[in-house]
């Protein structure tokens, strides 16, 4: 069992139940899934760019990404409906906890001038969105094999009803929020 999952089950649930006066263990919020999205704008003209993005996401997560397609045509971007323009991965279960552990303890501290993640990125329903400017913060990505520095969006979906509950959960898991 992953150490983050064990910490959640052994310590965090008890603390959350006391703090928010839950009557059942099932009311305590938990991390439901993590969605990692990498938009590849230059995939319209360069198909190799999308292949590299897919390969990098697969290295990070350990599962095959889903290629996302354009929903509608935009002439200004030379984009047609159905063209592949990005890749995404949805992580659940063990892989989700492994990725979250790696993100919090290894990758985020490697960001240049890192002072913590923003407290304002909650969506009002208990989910947290985090933008990463470069994929090089992850130890699996080899600097020499990267053709272009790309960012990604990481959405942490929780079962929490409010942002306050979600913030408390993520702080307990070790997410480094700004002071």
From Swiss-Prot:
Cellular component GO terms, alphabetical: ribonucleoprotein complex; ribosome
Keywords carried by this UniProt record: Ribonucleoprotein, Ribosomal protein, RNA-binding, rRNA-binding, tRNA-binding
UniProt superkingdom: Bacteria
Transmembrane region(s): none
UniProt xrefs under Gene3D superfamilies: 3.30.1440.10
InterPro entries: Ribosomal_uL5 (IPR002132), Ribosomal_uL5_bac-type (IPR020930), Ribosomal_uL5_C (IPR031309), Ribosomal_uL5_CS (IPR020929), Ribosomal_uL5_dom_sf (IPR022803), Ribosomal_uL5_N (IPR031310)
Biological processes per GO annotation: translation
GO molecular function: rRNA binding; structural constituent of ribosome; tRNA binding
Role, per record: This is one of the proteins that bind and probably mediate the attachment of the 5S RNA into the large ribosomal subunit, where it forms part of the central protuberance. In the 70S ribosome it contacts protein S13 of the 30S subunit (bridge B1b), connecting the 2 subunits; this bridge is implicated in subunit movement. Contacts the P site tRNA; the 5S rRNA and some of its associated proteins might help stabilize positioning of ribosome-bound tRNAs.
Self-association state and partner proteins as the record states: Part of the 50S ribosomal subunit; part of the 5S rRNA/L5/L18/L25 subcomplex. Contacts the 5S rRNA and the P site tRNA. Forms a bridge to the 30S subunit in the 70S ribosome.
Family designation: Belongs to the universal ribosomal protein uL5 family.
Identification of the protein by name: Large ribosomal subunit protein uL5
Organism: Exiguobacterium sibiricum (strain DSM 17290 / CCUG 55495 / CIP 109462 / JCM 13490 / 255-15)
Gene expressing this chain: rplE
């Amino acid at each position: 069992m992953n150490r983050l999952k064990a910490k959640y089950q052994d310590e965090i649930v008890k603390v959350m139940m006391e703090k928010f006066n839950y009557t059942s263990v099932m009311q305590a919020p938990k991390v439901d899934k993590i969605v990692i999205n990498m938009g590849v704008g230059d995939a319209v003209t360069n198909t190799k760019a999308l292949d590299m993005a897919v390969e990098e996401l697969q290295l990070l997560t350990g599962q095959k990404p889903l290629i996302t397609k354009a929903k509608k045509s935009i002439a200004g971007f030379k984009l047609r409906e159905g063209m592949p323009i990005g890749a995404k991965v949805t992580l659940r279960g063990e892989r989700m906890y492994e990725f979250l552990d790696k993100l919090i303890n290894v990758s985020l501290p490697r960001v240049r001038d890192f002072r913590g993640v923003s407290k304002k990125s909650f969506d009002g329903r208990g989910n947290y969105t985090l933008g990463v400017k470069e994929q090089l913060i992850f130890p699996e990505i080899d600097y020499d094999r990267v053709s272009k520095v790309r960012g990604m969006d990481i959405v942490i979906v929780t079962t929490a009803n409010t942002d306050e509950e979600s913030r408390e959960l993520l702080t307990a898991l070790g997410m480094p929020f700004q002071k």
